[in-house]
């Protein structure tokens, strides 16, 4: 199985390095309110559960980090992050298909 948390974490580190800002602690409230990277409520509900929970934190960090990037790099990082989040949500949905959430 692909380690989405690792992929997302590496992407975040690369983006942070690029804009030279440091990682900060983020609360789950901030995650739920600020995660503009995630495109839909259903994706949020999938990612909010299980092993992919950390991806929401990464999404919010990415959202903050990319505000400091030039527009062409912002698009690149947001698209890459969105791809990872969608794959993780799909994997989580498959895993939980027979469970009541």
List the predicted regions and their residue ranges:
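Acidic, low-complexity, intrinsically disordered interaction modules
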Residues: 42-45, 59, 65-69
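DNA-binding alpha-helical recognition surfaces that contact promoter or target DNA
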Residues: 10, 14, 42, 46, ...
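Short, charged recognition helix plus adjacent turn
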Residues: 2, 73-101
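Short, basic-rich loop-to-helix N-cap that marks the start of a DNA-contacting helix
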Residues: 50-64
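A short, Lys/Arg-rich alpha-helix, primarily the initiator
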Residues: 1-25
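Surface-exposed polar/charged interaction patches
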Residues: 18-22, 50, 68, 72, ...
